[in-house]
Amino acid sequence: MSDDPKTEFRDRLESIRTGMLEVDGRFLPMSHNVIEGDPKLWFITARETPMARAAAQGARARYLICSDGKGLYADIDGVLAVSNDEAKLDEIWNIVASSWFEDGKRDPDLLLVSYTPGEAETWMTEGGALGFLYQIAKAQVSDDKPDLGTHTTLNLA
């Protein structure tokens, strides 16, 4: 684990592919894209979706991550925006995205959306499910409290 919580958060987030994006009180499953050196998360969506409408208005949104395998649980607050950055689209384009858009990256229904995180409440654990069970068992036979990782609020702006 990195000594810097922001670095550790980004490293773990990069290895996770999905989360739940809250738009107008409704949670939508989405695949995010993390680009090294870029503080934003990137999404590809269709133009007539709740996410597209929210991005067109520069709306605030929450993105929730829950990954036992990577030991990251996060509630991220941020702002959505529509982007016309073709180089960014080229960088994040993948086979999953191509499954949704018949005409590929030039599909008229495709919309690139950036998500600029502001603050994230995070919980980071080590050892996955086995680590959790070990900590609980250890607490039962000792006077120690279980060490279930770190809980922090990160300013990502």
Give the label of every model feature segment.
Residues 9-27, 61-65:
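A short, Trp-centered hydrophobic/proline-enriched beta-strand micro-motif
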Residues 34-36, 124:
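Short, low-complexity Ser/Thr-rich regulatory SLiMs
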Residues 51-119:
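Short, structured beta-strand-loop surface elements
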Residues 108-157:
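C-terminal edge-of-domain segments
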Residues 1-18, 153, 157:
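N-terminal leader/targeting segments and the immediate start of mature chains
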Residues 37-42:
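Short active-site oxyanion
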Residues 29-32:
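Conserved beta-strand in the GNAT
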Residues 44-46:
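Short hydrophobic/aromatic beta-strand micro-patches
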